[in-house]
C-alpha cells in the first residue's frame, strides 16, 4: 500500500478535477491540475518520505514505478496506447519526483489527456466496425489476456486488434442466440457506455 500512496493521491486529484467537469465538455477540454491537486501530491510524497514506518523516498526510482503503474492503471490490457505514446513520455519516466516536488502536475495530466484521446479513437473505430459485415470464414486468433502483451507498435496494429476484439464480442453474442440487428445494437450501446464512463 505504501508504494501506491502517491499514485492514489494523484489519481484522486485527477478524479476530483474530472468530476467537476461537465461530461459533454471533457473531450474538448484538456484537463489541467488545480492548486489543491498539486498540494495533495506534494503532501502524499512528504508523508511517504517522512512519516511512514518504512520511509519511501520520492526519487527517480520511485518516479519510474509510479510512471509504470500509472500507465498500467489507465491501460492494463494495452488496448488504447500505442508504443509511440509510451515512447513520447519515456524521457520523463524518472522525472515525476521533480515535477511533484516543484508542484507541477503537467506530466500526469498530459498522459491522461492522450489516454482520453486514444480511448475516443478506439471506441469510435469499434463503433464504425459494427456497421460492417463480420467475416467468420477467416482462421485467426487473438490474445484475450493482454496484460503481458507488448504495446501495439502503431495505429494499424491497434486497429487490427480492435477488429478482432469487436469480432470476438459479436461472436459471443451470436453464439448466445442473438440476431445480427440485436448484436449491433447491444454492442453499440456497450461501447457508447464505455465512452461515457471515461468522460466522467
Q: Which residues does each PLM region occupy?
A:
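Gram-negative bacterial Sec-dependent N-terminal signal peptides
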Residues: 2-17
Amino acid at each position: 500500500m505504501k508504494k501506491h500512496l502517491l499514485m492514489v493521491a494523484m489519481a484522486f486529484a485527477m478524479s476530483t478535477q474530472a468530476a467537476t467537469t461537465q461530461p459533454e465538455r471533457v473531450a474538448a477540454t484538456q484537463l489541467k491540475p488545480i492548486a489543491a491537486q498539486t498540494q495533495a501530491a506534494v503532501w502524499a510524497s512528504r508523508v511517504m518520505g517522512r512519516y511512514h514506518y518504512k520511509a519511501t523516498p520520492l526519487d527517480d526510482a520511485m518516479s519510474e514505478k509510479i510512471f509504470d503503474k500509472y500507465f498500467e492503471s489507465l491501460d492494463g490490457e494495452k488496448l488504447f496506447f500505442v508504443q509511440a505514446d509510451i515512447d513520447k513520455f519515456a524521457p520523463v519516466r524518472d522525472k515525476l519526483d521533480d515535477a511533484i516536488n516543484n508542484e507541477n502536475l503537467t506530466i500526469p495530466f498530459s498522459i491522461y489527456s492522450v489516454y482520453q484521446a486514444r480511448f475516443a479513437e478506439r471506441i469510435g473505430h469499434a463503433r464504425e466496425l459494427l456497421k460492417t459485415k463480420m467475416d467468420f470464414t477467416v482462421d485467426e486468433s487473438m490474445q484475450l489476456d493482454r496484460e503481458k502483451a507488448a504495446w501495439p507498435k502503431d495505429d494499424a496494429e491497434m486497429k487490427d486488434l480492435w477488429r478482432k476484439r469487436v469480432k470476438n464480442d459479436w461472436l459471443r453474442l451470436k453464439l448466445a442466440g442473438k440476431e445480427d440487428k440485436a448484436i449491433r445494437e447491444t454492442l453499440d450501446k456497450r461501447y457508447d457506455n464505455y465512452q461515457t464512463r471515461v468522460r466522467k
